[in-house]
Amino acid sequence: MVSVEDIINLQLSKEEIIECIRKTQSVVFLDNLRKRHPNVQFDCKLRGYIGELAIKKWFLSNGIEIEATDYLPDGDSIDIDFIIAGSNIELKTSLMPDVDINIEGVLNKRDIKLIRRNGQSVEKLKGDIHMQIYYQQKTKAKDKWLSKQEVDLYSSDMDYLYTSLKAYAYLSTTFFVAWIDKNTIVKRINSLPVHKRCWSFPNSLREFWVCPLKSSNKPRELINYFKELLFIQGSVDTNHRNMSTYLE
């Protein structure tokens, strides 16, 4: 179970956010789910890269190195996958629903966003580990504000973009809330009645697997998970080398 005290606030600097703005400018993909204002699309991509940078910093500060990163355009957002200790980690980043007062409200009501693709079974879910970041910023209110702004998204003036898009809001509103491993989610979903396994937004083209944040895993437990996995892999590798030397 995850409590509000377990949630980790991932702090970023202005320079780091500007780095993410620059990265967002360099990537273009189409919003194939709904026609959204360019500013909103830009912000969707931006928060994906901000989440990536924030999580990488957090892993490194805890002695965990990321082996590889992959980016997959996904409608109006971007999926970011990491490889750590041979495990595939999928990172999801979301703004909070407007009805949620704060990050505690998100914890009590929301899920890790696990997309059910093309009606597939939960066994087909990609990724070994699924992490969920929520930004303490309200979705509809932010989208409405962004849609009213006149911003040159291709400006070379990073300070202008940082201010015009209110990117400074990401300095302290990035929260790593929870994570879950695939084996656990498969067992949980299969234990539920079929009609209670998925949920969706009104008028949405997507389904999500039921995965409440509160009953998922605490952020800090992910560090222990990978350290144990790396230790086991290191022990196996050492034993393999020792055996190879013996056989020589």
Question: Where are the language model's segments positioned?
Answer:
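Nucleic-acid endonuclease domains
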Residues: M1-D79, T93-E248
